[in-house]
Structures are given as structure tokens and as C-alpha cells.
């Protein structure tokens, strides 16, 4: 067979059957046939806002003939402040940065002392004891 596709059946129109647009192109041109090569070397769009700048002795004349000159106090000054520093404090001594959770087991003023001895989080005992004291009040 050749490089051409098979002909259409007898009596069919050949108007819609064409050769592929990538015929005769180099392999590197198959990837981006519609984009010019200059497109890849253009700089990206600006990511910073455009700020209108005023210069000293900017003279404006109104239709009435009044002359106005922009001086320093008339300049609009806008600036972005630095973001606030994030809090980065170490945990207190004998306190871990783990979520301590106490699940109440009924409405009882008494708290089983064996619960504190079997605590899997030994650094959270002060937290549990404060819950016990607050529940006893």
C-alpha cells in the first residue's frame, strides 16, 4: 500500500477525506503545530499590579484655563504592609503539643483514680486533674 489512505467506496464523495495536517512535518512540530516558536520565548504576564506614578511639577490645565500643579501632599501613597508574624512559641514545660481529650463517663463527682494511673499520655495528667477539680466544684 502507499502513504495514502484507501480510497472511499464507489460513489462516495471525497470532499471530506483529506491528508492529515501533520504530514510532512518534523516530529518536534507534531506537538505544537498551531503555536509559533516565538510563543515559548515570550515573557509571562506581569504578576505585580501596575501603579500610576506621579512626577513633580505635573501640570494640569482645565478648559477654563486654570493651571494646577501637583505638589507632594497631593500624591496618593498606597503600600502593602508586611504580613503579621506567625506565633511560633514552644510548648510550656511538661506540656506536649498533642490534643488531650477527656471523655466523661456519666455525671459523677467522683473520678476513678485508676483512670489517671493508666493514662497513656503521662504529660496530660495535669490537664485531666484540672478537669477533675473543675468537676468537683
UniProtKB/Swiss-Prot annotation:
It is found in: Plastid, Chloroplast. Its main location: plastid. Keywords: Chloroplast, Plastid. The gene is ycf72-1. The keyword Chloroplast applies. It comes from Zea mays (Maize). Belongs to the ycf72 family. This is Uncharacterized protein ycf72. GO terms for cellular component: chloroplast. It comes from the Eukaryota.
Amino acid at each position: 500500500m502507499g502513504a495514502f489512505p484507501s480510497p472511499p467506496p464507489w460513489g462516495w464523495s471525497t470532499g471530506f477525506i483529506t491528508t492529515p495536517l501533520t504530514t510532512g512535518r518534523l516530529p518536534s512540530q507534531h506537538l505544537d503545530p498551531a503555536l509559533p516558536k516565538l510563543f515559548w520565548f515570550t515573557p509571562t504576564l506581569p504578576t505585580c499590579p501596575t501603579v500610576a506614578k506621579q512626577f513633580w511639577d505635573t501640570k494640569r490645565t482645565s478648559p477654563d484655563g486654570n493651571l494646577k500643579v501637583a505638589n507632594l501632599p497631593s500624591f496618593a501613597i498606597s503600600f502593602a504592609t508586611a504580613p503579621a508574624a506567625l506565633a511560633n512559641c514552644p510548648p510550656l514545660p511538661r506540656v506536649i503539643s498533642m490534643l488531650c481529650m477527656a471523655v466523661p463517663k456519666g455525671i459523677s463527682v467522683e473520678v476513678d483514680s485508676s483512670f489517671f494511673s493508666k493514662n497513656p499520655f503521662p504529660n496530660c495528667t495535669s490537664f485531666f486533674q484540672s478537669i477533675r477539680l473543675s468537676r468537683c466544684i
